[in-house]
């Protein structure tokens, strides 16, 4: 099975003030907030891709869950 952004587990929660948070456990520090569940998911997915791109730019390895997103054919 191919890895896709949808198959990377995202933890979700809602703060007392109503904001939603989303976190990707395999990428420490990748957490985002949004006014809705969907907005938080979208924000954390975009952040995860930015962090992965930065890791690649600096010659570092991306988490194994993201490897197939960037592997050559």
Give, region by region, the residue ranges found by the protein language model.
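Short, charged, surface-exposed hinge/linker loops at domain edges
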Residues: 1-9, 38-73
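Short amphipathic alpha-helical segments, especially helix-boundary/capping motifs
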Residues: 4-5, 26-28
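Short aromatic-glycine-(Arg/Gly/Cys) micro-motifs in beta-strand/loop hairpins
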Residues: 12-27
């Amino acid at each position: 099975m191919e890895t896709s952004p949808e198959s990377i587990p995202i933890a979700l929660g809602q703060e007392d003030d109503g904001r939603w948070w989303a976190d990707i456990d395999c990428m420490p520090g990748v957490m985002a907030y949004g006014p809705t569940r969907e907005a938080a998911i979208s924000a954390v997915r975009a952040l995860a891709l930015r962090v992965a791109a930065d890791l690649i730019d600096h010659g570092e390895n991306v988490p194994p869950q993201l490897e197939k997103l960037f592997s050559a054919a």
